[in-house]
Regions:
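Extracytoplasmic small-molecule ligand-binding "clamshell" domains
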Residues: 25-99
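Bilobed "Venus flytrap"/periplasmic-binding protein-like clamshell domains
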Residues: 37, 43, 56-69, 123-171, ...
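Extended ligand-binding regions for polar small-molecule ligands
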Residues: 62-70, 130, 143, 150-151, ...
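Acidic, polar ligand-binding/catalytic clefts
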Residues: 65, 69, 74-138, 202
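Short helix-initiation/N-cap motifs at beta->coil->alpha
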Residues: 77-87, 131, 148-150, 164-178, ...
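A ligand-binding cleft/hinge motif common to bilobed small-molecule-binding domains
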Residues: 101-109, 155-158, 182-211
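Short Pro/Gly-enriched coil loops immediately N-terminal to beta-strands
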Residues: 111-123, 140, 157, 168, ...
Length: 257
C-alpha cells in the first residue's frame, strides 16, 4: 500500500506545482510582475491596431492601459490572430484578452467576463436625404448592401430586402452613398468610427435594434480576485472621466450602453 501513498503524494505535489501555471496569473502575481499581460489582435481598427508610426493604439488598447493603471501595473500587450486569441488564455500566454470579445453563454461556460465595457447595436443606415426608409420594416422590396453571411444580412433578408453582396462595412457604405443600394444594416460602432473620420458623409442612422451586444474583458475561470479588480477598475475609469475621454476620442460619444 506504500506505493499507493507515494503515488498519491506525487500526484498531489504535481497538482500543486502545476496549478498556478494552469490557473494562470492571479492578482498577486500580476502585481508582483508589475504588468497585466493582455492578448489582442492589433489588426482591428479602431479597437486595436497600429498607427502610421507602428505603435499599437485603439479603443481597446487604451481601455487596457487604463485598467492596468488602476491595478498599479503597466499594460503589456501580446498580439495574436483572432482564431487563436482566446485559446492563448488556456496556454497561459496572458492574463486577459481585450479585443471586442462578445459576451456569450458559450464562452461563459469556460471563461469569466468582466462587466461589459462597450455595447454595439445593429443599425439601419440610409442616405441622409432618403425619406422613404424610416424603419427596418421599410426595407421590404429595397436593396440592402450586406455581407451575405453576416447576421446583419439575415436581419435585412428577414425584413424583405433584396441583398446586394459586399465584402464588409466600407463597401456597403459606398454602395449606399452612390445609390447602388438603398440601405445597409451594420454595426453601430463601425458607423460611429466612420462618421468620426468622415463627418460630412451623406449617410445617417434611421433606426436601431433595441437589444445590444456587449463585450467584456475575458479571463480564465478561477481568478476571482483579478476579476474583481478589473471590474473595480472599469467602475473607476467611468467615474473619473477616463472612459468618457477614450470613448469620445474614438467614437465621439459614450459607447458603454
Amino acid at each position: 500500500m506504500n506505493w499507493l501513498k507515494t503515488l498519491a503524494a506525487a500526484a498531489a505535489l504535481q497538482a500543486a506545482v502545476l496549478a498556478p501555471a494552469h490557473a494562470g496569473e492571479n492578482l498577486s502575481a500580476v502585481k508582483a510582475a508589475g504588468a497585466l499581460k493582455i492578448g489582442t489582435e492589433g489588426t482591428y481598427a479602431p479597437f486595436t491596431y497600429h498607427d502610421a508610426d507602428g505603435k499599437l493604439v485603439g479603443f481597446d488598447v487604451e481601455i487596457g492601459e487604463a485598467i492596468a493603471k488602476k491595478l498599479g501595473v503597466k499594460a503589456e500587450f501580446l498580439e495574436g490572430k483572432w482564431d487563436g486569441l482566446i485559446a492563448g488564455l488556456d496556454a497561459n500566454r496572458y492574463d486577459a484578452v481585450i479585443n471586442q470579445v462578445g459576451i456569450t453563454e458559450a464562452r461563459k461556460q469556460k471563461y469569466d467576463f468582466s462587466e461589459p465595457y462597450i455595447a454595439s447595436k445593429a443599425v439601419l443606415i440610409v442616405r441622409a436625404d432618403d425619406e422613404s426608409i424610416k424603419s427596418f420594416a421599410d426595407l421590404k422590396g429595397k436593396k440592402s448592401a450586406q455581407s451575405l453571411t453576416s447576421n446583419f444580412g439575415k436581419i435585412a433578408e428577414g425584413a424583405g430586402a433584396e441583398l446586394v453582396g459586399t465584402d464588409g462595412f466600407d463597401q456597403s457604405i459606398q454602395l449606399v452613398l452612390t445609390g447602388r443600394a438603398d440601405a445597409t444594416i451594420n454595426d453601430s460602432l463601425s458607423f460611429l468610427d466612420f462618421k468620426k473620420h468622415k463627418p460630412d458623409a451623406n449617410v445617417k442612422i434611421i433606426a436601431e435594434q433595441e437589444n445590444a451586444d456587449y463585450s467584456g474583458v475575458i479571463i480564465r475561470k478561477g481568478e476571482p480576485e483579478l476579476l474583481e479588480a478589473i471590474n473595480k477598475a472599469l467602475v473607476d475609469i467611468k467615474a473619473d472621466g477616463t472612459y468618457q475621454a477614450i470613448s469620445d476620442k474614438y467614437f465621439g460619444q459614450d459607447v458603454s450602453k
